[in-house]
């Protein structure tokens, strides 16, 4: 009897102390699902870009807001979502893990590690979609970002905070230039982010292996949305990379980010848009494809001193078809960026590597970031190459050329030999300036074209190993043009070296 009284008392106490907490969930139902996209009804208050959750904890992003249906891209296999599934609002936007813990890691577009290493601490997160810095939060580009590639650093220099497009046909060395730029940041306190969009997993694995071998992976993060990934993940990948880079920029760091490549990103977004039943435009791309790329690239900036002075330098890559830079996506990105490095397959196939077309390549703001010494040393280079290319076109018709014209042709051929550079072997600014002085002062005229590669190797070794000459070079002030006396001394040493080389006394 006492036992029954105790039970009754417990029940009575529970009833008296019961607090009914009502949880209000805004829910809807999946009407149609297929190809990674679900059309959902019933969650009218959802916001654009908001995360929604399906029954089995699968997440999606609301990208289409119509009167009766919401278009949601599914962030997992579509087989995990069924018609009639319940969908719930999360009232939050998609975010990604950020911080120094990402250095030396490979993650997917959602920030989940895919390199088999330790899990990440998810306490520090940042929204993937954020606004670009305002005009008042920026300042002019005034610091150079060295790629270690002579043709780029002298002719199309890149500054920290700049957006420089790398454009060309497939297999012309676009990714190679980007990776060389990452390798050259070693010891320069620049963090790097490499975003692979629609690339083969095997190719990205080779890049990661190379970065590890060269000691560059310790300051690099790789984001992979491979060719086998769903279109939503390929679409999100560059924005995830930008969010990771922005964290460091706001911490007063300099960041280099590579988008490889935005052509595949545009195709992924086109796929999503067509599945979401958006009206197609030119080349079947949606009307806001320009906005998607401008919104992404405007997040790269040189922040003002009041905002810490950090920077994001972006090197987006675009693949062209048969060298056609007048297609829709190439012209879009060219108009958004601060210049482009155009790679031509005919140059690549002829052995000119990097295969940069000097006439079509330009840097609109990077020259302001060059040191005065580099500006002086490279001042005549573009003119020499322009004269060479103009004369070369006439020479193809078999016209008789005078001695002065022949000299310009011979000099141009030798300059192109000097500009050839092996990948994975960046040059220091000091080495670049010495090679440019050879060209500026016409010292290469006394060399044979076929001996240029051997001479270049021997000359760079001489610059680093000859104590007296090295001391003269190291005393050069990069912010000032060479004084006549100092230049005369350097030119005498170079002339003596060339004479020894021509006599076969240099090995």
Curated annotation (Swiss-Prot):
Membrane topology term: Peripheral membrane protein
The UniProt record lists the keyword DNA-binding: no
SUPFAM superfamilies per the UniProt record, alphabetical: C-terminal domain of alpha and beta subunits of F1 ATP synthase, N-terminal domain of alpha and beta subunits of F1 ATP synthase, P-loop containing nucleoside triphosphate hydrolases
Subcellular location(s) per record: Cell membrane
Matching Gene3D superfamilies: 2.40.30.20, ATP synthase alpha/beta chain, C-terminal domain (1.20.150.20), P-loop containing nucleotide triphosphate hydrolases (3.40.50.300)
Binding site for ATP: 168-175
GO CC, alphabetical: plasma membrane; proton-transporting ATP synthase complex
EC assignment: 7.1.2.2
Family matches, as CDD domains: ATP-synt_F1_alpha_C, ATP-synt_F1_alpha_N, F1-ATPase_alpha_CD
Superkingdom: Bacteria
Keywords: ATP synthesis, ATP-binding, Cell membrane, CF(1), Hydrogen ion transport, Ion transport, Membrane, Nucleotide-binding, Translocase, Transport
Reaction it catalyzes: ATP + H2O + 4 H(+)(in) = ADP + phosphate + 5 H(+)(out)
InterPro entries reported for this sequence: ATP_synth_asu-like_sf, ATP_synth_asu_C, ATP_synth_asu_C_sf, ATP_synth_F1_a_nt-bd_dom, ATP_synth_F1_asu, ATPase_a/bsu_AS, ATPase_F1/V1/A1_a/bsu_N, ATPase_F1/V1/A1_a/bsu_N_sf
Presence of keyword Phosphoprotein: no
Purpose of the protein: Produces ATP from ADP in the presence of a proton gradient across the membrane. The alpha chain is a regulatory subunit.
HAMAP family (UniProt xref): ATP_synth_alpha_bact
Protein name: ATP synthase subunit alpha
Gene label: atpA
């Amino acid at each position: 009897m006492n036992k029954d009284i105790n039970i009754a008392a417990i029940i009575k106490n529970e009833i008296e102390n019961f607090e009914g907490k009502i949880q209000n969930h805004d829910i809807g139902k999946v009407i149609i699902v297929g190809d990674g996209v679900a059309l959902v009804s019933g969650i009218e208050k959802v916001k654009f870009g908001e995360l929604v959750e399906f029954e089995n904890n699968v997440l999606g992003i609301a990208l289409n807001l119509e009167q009766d249906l919401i278009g949601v891209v599914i962030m997992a296999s579509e087989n995990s979502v069924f018609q009639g599934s319940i969908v719930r609002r999360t009232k939050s936007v998609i975010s990604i893990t950020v911080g120094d813990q990402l250095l030396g890691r490979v993650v997917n577009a959602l920030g989940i590690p895919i390199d088999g290493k330790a899990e990440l601490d998810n306490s520090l997160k940042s929204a993937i979609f954020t606004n670009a810095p305002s005009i008042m939060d920026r300042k002019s580009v005034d610091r150079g970002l060295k790629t270690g590639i002579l043709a780029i650093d002298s002719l199309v220099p890149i500054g920290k905070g700049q957006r420089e497009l790398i454009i060309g046909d497939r297999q012309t060395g676009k990714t190679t230039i980007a990776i060389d730029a990452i390798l050259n940041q070693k010891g320069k306190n620049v963090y790097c982010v490499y975003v692979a969009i629609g690339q083969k997993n095997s190719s990205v694995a080779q890049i990661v292996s190379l970065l590890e071998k060269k000691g560059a992976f310790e300051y690099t993060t790789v984001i992979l949305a491979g060719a086998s990934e769903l279109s939503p993940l390929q679409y999100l990948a560059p924005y995830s990379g930008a969010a990771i880079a922005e964290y460091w920029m706001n911490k007063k760091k300099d960041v280099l980010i590579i988008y490889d490549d935005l052509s595949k990103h545009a195709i992924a977004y086109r796929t999503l848009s067509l599945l979401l039943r958006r009206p197609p435009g030119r080349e079947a791309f949606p009307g806001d494809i320009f906005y998607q790329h401008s919104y992404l690239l405007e997040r790269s900036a040189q922040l003002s001193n009041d905002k810490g002075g950090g920077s994001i330098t972006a090197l987006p890559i675009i693949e062209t078809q048969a060298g056609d830079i007048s297609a829709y996506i190439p012209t879009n990105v060219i108009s958004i960026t601060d210049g482009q490095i155009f790679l031509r397959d005919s140059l690549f196939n002829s052995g000119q590597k990097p295969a940069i077309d000097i006439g079509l390549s330009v840097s609109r703001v990077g020259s302001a970031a060059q040191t005065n010494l580099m500006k002086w040393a490279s001042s005549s280079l573009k003119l020499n190459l322009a004269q060479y290319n103009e004369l070369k076109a006439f020479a193809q018709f078999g016209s008789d050329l005078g001695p002065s014209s022949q000299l310009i042709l011979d000099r141009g051929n030798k300059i192109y030999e000097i500009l050839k550079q092996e990948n994975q072997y960046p040059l220091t600014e000091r080495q670049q300036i010495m090679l440019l002085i050879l060209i500026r002062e016409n010292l290469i005229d006394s060399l044979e074209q076929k001996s240029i590669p051997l001479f270049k190797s021997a000359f760079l070794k001489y610059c680093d190993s000859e104590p007296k000459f090295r001391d003269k070079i190291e005393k050069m002030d990069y912010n000032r043009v060479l004084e006549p006396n100092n230049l005369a001394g350097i030119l005498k040493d170079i002339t003596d070296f060339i004479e020894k080389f021509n006599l076969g006394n240099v090995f």
